[in-house]
Amino acid sequence: MKRRHLLAAGIGALAAPAVARANAKFPDRTLRLVVPFPAGGATDVVGRMFADKLTQQLGQTVFVDNKSGAAGSIGAMEVKNAKPDGYTLLVATSSTHAINPTAYVNPPYDAVRNFTPISSVCVNPLVLYANPAMPDTMMGLIGLMKKYPGKYSYGSAGIGSIIHLAAEYLKRSVGGMDVVHVPYKGGAPAIQDTIAGNIAWSMETFSTTLPLHRAGKLRILAFCHSGRAAIAPEIPTMIEAGVPGYEAYTFSLILGPAGMPQDVIDVLDKASRQAMADPNTIKFLEGNASIPTPDTTPERTAQFIKDELAKWAPIIRDANVRIA
């Protein structure tokens, strides 16, 4: 009897390291990438592309799970509350990790402390577009707005949207403009009313505005990034157009829940770097008017979030954006 106990104990001792090794092998099953917005949108498109790239690098399926609502907060909360084992990740955006934490009266999460940064995929700069009857340069448009205070209006995708805040940021950057804000339920109605001449201008991404610009239905005056867009190099940056230092964009980051093990972070970091080193990834992102961020690291991603929070917080407060 004693011999059997000793034998069992010996087998257990031998088996324990094997189990530990098996548990340490990450990943050994399917991963979930939460996209906090509906299927078919810009964030979803980037998320699905990156999920495919991670699948190739990790040797395990990474599937996209759309959890939309509350300007991305529902999806962010889904990941915040997930087990920190690396199998549930988030495509974080400007809404979830630059705007909501300040705009919400009672934010449901801390954008820094409740998440583990993995990688940055891209930024998607906005453009400023106007009705074709408006001046054809940024300085001309700004001059007109200042000459006739309160006469003209701009549209946004809603109060607290990146478009609203980017416009408020522009007003600050040019020393103030008295222009009326017209919030819409999404960017598409603002585009239609700009074309119709009901509002003077708005901001959006290239993907929805460039075809209309080239068709002459609206005019893109500036690209809101430090460098010109590869798909439309003829359009000046906002800085070139006369607004020093101005950049406004959405972004796509890969984050996990807080408390992830370092070895799991390292695996995901390596896979993300390899995915971003793929020329097809760069081609895909640039084709969608995004700016790839291939030199990212978890540390740089963490700093990027802090910088974006610091940039937008005073603009949100000055615009008196408070979401209950």
Describe each model-derived feature in a short phrase.
Residues 22-112, 151, 175-200, 295, ...:
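N-terminal (or domain-start) structured segment
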Residues 81-87, 102-189, 238, 251-284:
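Hinge/capping helix and adjacent helix->loop/strand transition within the periplasmic-binding protein
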Residues 51, 55, 59, 80-84, ...:
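Sec-exported extracytoplasmic/periplasmic mature domains
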Residues 137, 209-278, 307-310:
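C-terminal lobe and pocket-closing loops
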Residues 5-22:
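N-terminal export signals
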Residues 28-30, 263-324:
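An extracytoplasmic/periplasmic, membrane-proximal ligand-sensing/linker region
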Residues 94-95, 123, 133, 206-207, ...:
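Solvent-exposed coil/turn segments that connect beta secondary-structure elements
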